[in-house]
């Protein structure tokens, strides 16, 4: 192989390795954000009740435990299934859009694009697993699953209302 070809091959190999390393760093950062931002609290079955002692192989597979409040009853999506056919641009738009409670939409909207992309890349790195979450139930609808009741009770009257 001539010297110019060797140099070109070495440069290409270095670029590929650098890109792979950057991808791995994004995935590690995404895992960190998922672990520290509370994503597992709702999107991983049993995570809160087991004080986080859930294998990573079960993370972000959604849950049948609902969250009920004045908005109705919502369920944490199986993010692995959700992201399966979603591109990064769609994820960024969805993360910036309002979502039903108790999803902390303001927290997602406050994240930098780089952080949201890292979360996306981490979730995409996980094998697709699990079933879709149950469908949203509007206020007053029949709920067939266990759920947490987040309906405010005994609130004092609001000033000016």
For the regions a language model picked out, list residue spans one by one.
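Short, solvent-exposed loop/turn segments at the edges of secondary structure
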Residues: 1, 72-74, 98
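Flexible coil segments in periplasmic/lumen-exposed cytochrome c-class electron-transfer proteins
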Residues: 36, 44-74, 105-161
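Bacterial N-terminal signal peptides that target proteins for export
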Residues: 1-9
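Peptidoglycan-targeting cell-wall enzymes and recognition modules
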Residues: 72-87
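Solvent-exposed, polar/charged alpha-helical surfaces in well-ordered, non-transmembrane soluble domains
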Residues: 28-32, 40, 77, 89, ...
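Electrostatic cytochrome c docking/interface patches
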Residues: 18-35, 47-51, 88
């Amino acid at each position: 192989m001539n010297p110019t070809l060797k140099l070109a091959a070495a440069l290409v190999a270095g670029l590929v390795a650098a890109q792979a390393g950057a991808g791995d760093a994004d995935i590690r950062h995404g895992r960190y954000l998922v672990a520290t931002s509370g994503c597992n609290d709702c999107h991983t079955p049993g995570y809160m009740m087991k004080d986080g002692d859930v294998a990573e192989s079960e993370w972000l597979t959604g849950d049948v435990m609902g969250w009920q409040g004045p908005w109705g009853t919502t369920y944490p999506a199986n993010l692995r299934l959700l992201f399966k056919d979603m591109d990064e641009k769609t994820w960024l738009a969805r993360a910036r859009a309002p979502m039903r409670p108790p999803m902390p939409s303001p927290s997602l909207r406050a994240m930098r694009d780089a952080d949201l992309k890292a979360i996306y890349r981490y979730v995409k790195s996980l094998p697709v697993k699990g079933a879709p979450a149950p469908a949203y139930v509007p206020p007053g609808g029949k709920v067939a699953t266990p759920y947490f009741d987040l309906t405010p009770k005994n609130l004092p009257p609001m000033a000016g209302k």
